[in-house]
Amino acid sequence: TRQPTKAATAINNKMLTIIQNINSGRLSVRMRKAAILACFDGKQKLSTVCHIMCGFRLKHRRIMDFFTAWFETPWLYAAYIALPACLLLCAKPALKAWRQNPQAFGILLCFFAVFWSLGAGLDGGQLGGLRYHLLGVALGSLMVGSAAAFWLAALFMLPHMLLTVGAQNLAAAPLNVLAVTLPALAVAELLRYAVRRFLPPNLFLYIFINGFFCAAAGMMATGAAITALLSQSTVFAAVDLWQQAFPVFFLISWGEAFLTGMFTAIFVALKPQFLLTFDDDFYLSRQNTIWPSES
């Protein structure tokens, strides 16, 4: 019998949890084959294992675009209940934001299309073939408010998933929306409240914290939520996602932060009416100065 290499020892140990379920009938024939394959070939890429387990390949697929086969039914059903509830709670403020500036909604949809098409990933290792994309959620929260940004992201997720994972995986769309958008929006709301509550009304603070820093922190929060969620999936049982997948979110958070901060500064200078959360009277009044000696 072929013995696994030292590099595959950790992977093989985690695959034992899958093997233990083989006799219980919880795994399909494909998953049984994948368990055996992973144990005797620890260098096998996760994309190949997933192809055997679930019938799809992970090449050029994004870890932030969910497949239905990644999750058990209770997770999907819970998302079917949670997403409509969240949308209902956000409906009134989202409608108010729409009435104030509908043009900003169209611009934000264009930003979503651009941000979500910009991706990065690793080509080697167990997670070779998986891709990550930017969000633009922090920018959306500044433009139309968190409630409206959540609605737009939920609507945009449908055509996005049709193009990336296909109609057969739309059942995972509600869970995808919750995992990708809610953490980043929660961070945006928290930081924006902290800036207005505890810091002086400074234009630099608005751009740097609400734009740059908030986008980076939101991406990290989304990455943590996705990693924690996918860690519960048997498809990724052979991989330590916290060590191999989560660090990538830290890298792409810089791109998210740079683009969000740049567009925030542009809007403040040229089109402040596109920023629902920006108030000229609050941030640009004469008594607000950068240096104490100017007052």
Description of each model-found segment:
Residues 1-17, 24:
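Ser/Thr-rich, low-complexity intrinsically disordered segments
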